């Protein structure tokens, strides 16, 4: 049990909690800390030489604060000193130790990036969700969203990030990368992520988002014609899938006022399932504030997205009043 500080006693008498503190308590309860620490442990410095390293769980908690609140390394360090809720979540007691500095957090983040540990966190969470019945098999919803990147050339290199590209969405030009996701059609939880430059069409990454046991795939009208693509036709499993793609509204037949428009009824039924893919995007963009890339290049941002979607899956599960225990 953690030692109580004067701040803990003072804050315990408050009449209400902030939304930030409530969110951190939800995540603290649902994250499988022992499993995540075990994933990091083989790659973490042993401390046999030099200064003893900070605890793995402490650094992981500090990194999660950075990811969830979209903070810089220095901003995360300052936030822990400023915010009681964040300090409590990380587990820092100023009577015993100071918060890890920005450089220590930077080295920890690079450790996660170098060994692709965020993907291991994501896969571990999804494996448990399948085993406990929270994520079912058989159906996937596919979609993609653009994450903006700085388009300016006013920097030391006088050029944009070469791994990002521009694309036109509607009447607006966007510059950045595109995040493609495959979502479980039953639960709305993300099971697969693919990251590409923004100019790659949504339909090009579809084959990588489909699971081996999927029988049905839902998508918006941007995925029309998916069943005719070479990578789909040439694959025995992918060619046998039922692709329920929404048609464009302009292609639907018009009927008289007194008749039932069955085309629209069918499209509405598809949309009622397909809309589940928008919920994870709302969490990472609106709750976690990840509307712009945090780093240069696709690899580092992909690593961050794995943690964001792992956290989004856990938050969605907790928000519905469930836990990682068996659903039945």
What are these regions (language model features)?
Residues 49-57, 296-305:
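Structural motif
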Residues 303-309, 313-315, 319-328:
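C-terminal domain-tail junction helix/linker
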Residues 2, 65, 74, 78-82, ...:
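Polybasic low-complexity intrinsically disordered regions
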Residues 16-64:
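Basic, short loop/linker segments at the boundary and entry of helix-turn-helix/winged-helix-like folds
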Residues 5, 10, 215-216, 221-299, ...:
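Helix-centered, glycine/charged polyanion-binding patches within enzymatic domains
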Residues 1-34, 319, 323-328:
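Charged, often Cys/His-bearing segments associated with DNA-binding zinc-finger transcription factors
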Residues 37-45, 126, 281, 285:
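Amphipathic, well-packed alpha-helical segments that form the structural scaffold of globular domains
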